[in-house]
Amino acid sequence: MATTTCQVVGLLLSLLGLAGCIAATGMDMWSTQDLYDNPVTSVFQYEGLWRSCVQQSSGFTECRPYFTILGLPAMLQAVRALMIVGIVLGVIGILVSIFALKCIRIGSMDDSAKAKMTLTSGIMFIISGVCAIIGVSVFANMLVTNFWMSTANMYSGMGGMVQTVQTRYTFGAALFVGWIAGGLTLIGGVMMCIACRGLTPDDRNFKAVSYHASGQNVAYKPGGFKASTGFGSNARNKKIYDGGARTEDDEQSHPTKYDYV
């Protein structure tokens, strides 16, 4: 029961984390314009992994996709790759973990096969969560670097006496969604790996005394003592008295009470 519960909880957490990773990858608010010390408030800009958007004070929003691949920063392309790899591994892990549930029987599949499938799905979930967390963290580090570079350029004119207008970007909502989703997927993978231990058959060896069914030539030897039933090989050379098998001379030398009539 505990193994099934651990599997189901791990699957649900991983499924929720995978949905969060997909949502974060498709969101446009990976970076949002910092409005602090910005005199222009009628225009709000934000960017995602696939396009950049401009929102006006009237409520009209215009988005423009990135029409180039080679012209994009290498960090942005790396983040894209990490998020896509995390999503693909998460989808495969979900499919494997569904068939690995202990409460689902498929043909003659035993617990050892389900244990291997559970461990495989758990490892996939862990890698998927790590990819999502690394991708979001790399993008966040890029934002922090650009933010402080833009801040330094704002106060560089005329010895810092003249402030120039610079567009600075800060963390968007997609970063927090990606961090939470990656953490949930990672926790789900750990729980699936823990559930694998409950499905693994116990192969430990225990010391025991071998027992054989009793027979004519069976001898039990505990600690050097030998006991025999009397019907073994040692008893074959012994002469056994048989009152029913006598010769004629034996009958004459050993009369019975019926001989005196």
Curated annotation (Swiss-Prot):
Entry keyword annotation includes Thylakoid: no
Expression sites (tissue/organ): Expressed in the lung (at protein level).
Record GO biological process: bicellular tight junction assembly; cell adhesion; cellular response to estrogen stimulus; digestive tract development; epithelial cell proliferation; epithelial fluid transport; lung alveolus development; negative regulation of bone resorption
GO CC terms in record: bicellular tight junction; cell-cell junction; plasma membrane; tight junction
Annotated Gene3D superfamilies: 1.20.140.150
Membrane spanning residue stretches: 7-27, 81-101, 123-143, 174-194
Residue intervals annotated with topology Cytoplasmic: 1-6, 102-122, 195-261
Region Required for role in regulation of RANKL-induced osteoclast differentiation, residue ranges: 195-261
Membrane topology: Multi-pass membrane protein
Parts of the chain on the Extracellular side: 28-80, 144-173
Span list, region Disordered: 242-261
Keywords: Cell junction, Cell membrane, Membrane, Phosphoprotein, Tight junction, Transmembrane, Transmembrane helix
A molecular function (GO) term: structural molecule activity
Oligomeric and partner information: Interacts with TJP2/ZO-2. Interacts with TJP1/ZO-1. Interacts with YAP1 (phosphorylated); the interaction sequesters YAP1 away from the nucleus and thereby restricts transcription of YAP1 target genes. Interacts with CLDN19.
Biological role stated in the UniProt entry: Involved in alveolar fluid homeostasis via regulation of alveolar epithelial tight junction composition and therefore ion transport and solute permeability, potentially via downstream regulation of the actin cytoskeleton organization and beta-2-adrenergic signaling. Required for lung alveolarization and maintenance of the paracellular alveolar epithelial barrier. Acts to maintain epithelial progenitor cell proliferation and organ size, via regulation of YAP1 localization away from the nucleus and thereby restriction of YAP1 target gene transcription.
Family: Belongs to the claudin family.
This protein's name: Claudin-18
